[in-house]
């Protein structure tokens, strides 16, 4: 498309993340524009976050359905505060959702640009994938670092391992955490839907050691095999710093989404 600024490799983008808007929704809800994504509420959500002083907007995954006549990039204004927006494109079909590119929209000197990549893995077979994970740590992690933040998409946090045979702690056998540069203060971890296994919380705590924030946000609406909702009434996000949970309350709004704001100073 003419006029687009699209980066295929490291965007040379530098941001100091200080205030993060965290946005989630029920992914079964169809909005007034007919789509089960964020596109209907996105302009108002971004305006609200900008007014609240956020420099970063992190949306739960399955974020935007790409389609003819809808293109977010050229519509982004010169916000006073927002410098980075993270969303995932996806297909919404009768048989379920299919994830596409993860897209980082970021402010460059000459306007908004976009940087695309795909989730590298979710579940891990440690016997079969050790070499793959080592390559991810060495090659892919550097491409996910944007100034003071790094992005791990959904189950990529499984790149650190729960030692179920030994001391029952989390370890880093393939160097995924070690590959994140020391200057990174925030790990952004957008998620598709709620991960209920106990070790996911342990892995987020582990990744947050050393004073980093780990921000995870997911969609509500996940159902079990009997059709019962698995989310309950809890918040659709967690935040940890240095192994401890950081509370982030809901921001009241009438936009049909759930919003929290984290001061990562």
What are these regions (language model features)?
Residues 54, 82, 100-102, 148-149, ...:
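Short, surface-exposed beta-edge/turn micro-motifs
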Residues 31-38, 60-69, 94-97, 124-128, ...:
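Acidic-and-aromatic substrate-binding clefts and catalytic sites of carbohydrate-active enzymes
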Residues 62-85, 90, 97, 160-261:
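CN hydrolase (nitrilase-like) catalytic-core segments centered on the catalytic cysteine
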Residues 14-16, 47-53, 77-79, 143-146, ...:
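Flexible, charged surface loops at secondary-structure boundaries
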Residues 6-33, 147-158, 188-190:
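Active-site-proximal beta-strand elements of phosphoester/diester hydrolases
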Residues 16-71:
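Short, conserved active-site loops that position catalytic residues or coordinate cofactors/metal ions
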Residues 2, 94-185, 255-265:
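Active-site catalytic loop in hydrolytic enzyme cores
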Residues 23-25, 118, 217:
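Conserved beta-strand termini and adjacent loop/short-helix elements that scaffold enzyme active sites
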């Amino acid at each position: 498309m003419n006029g687009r600024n699209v980066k295929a490799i490291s965007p040379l983008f530098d941001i100091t993340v200080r205030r993060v808007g965290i946005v989630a929704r029920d992914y079964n809800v169809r909005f007034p524009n007919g789509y089960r994504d964020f596109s209907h509420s996105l302009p108002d959500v971004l305006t609200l976050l900008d007014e609240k002083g956020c420099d970063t907007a992190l949306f739960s995954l399955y974020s935007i359905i790409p389609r003819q006549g809808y293109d977010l990039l050229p519509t982004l204004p010169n916000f006073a505060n927002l410098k980075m927006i993270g969303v995932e494109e996806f297909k919404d079909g009768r048989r379920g959702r299919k994830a596409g590119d993860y897209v980082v929209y970021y402010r460059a000197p000459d306007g908004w640009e976009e940087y695309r990549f795909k989730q590298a893995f979710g579940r891990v077979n440690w016997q079969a994938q050790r070499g793959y994970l080592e390559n991810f740590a060495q090659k892919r992690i550097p491409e996910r670092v944007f100034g003071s933040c790094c992005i791990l998409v959904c189950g990529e946090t499984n790149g650190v391992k729960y030692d179920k045979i030994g001391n029952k702690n989390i370890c880093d056998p393939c160097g995924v955490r070690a590959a994140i540069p020391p200057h990174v203060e925030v790990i952004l971890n957008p998620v598709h839907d709620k991960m209920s296994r106990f070790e996911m919380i342990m892995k987020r705590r582990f990744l947050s050691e050393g004073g980093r924030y780990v921000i995870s946000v997911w969609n509500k609406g996940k159902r079990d095999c009997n059709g019962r909702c698995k989310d309950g009434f809890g918040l659709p996000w967690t935040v940890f710093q240095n192994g401890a949970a950081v509370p982030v309350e809901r921001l009241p709004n009438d936009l049909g989404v759930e919003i929290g704001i984290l001061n990562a100073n």
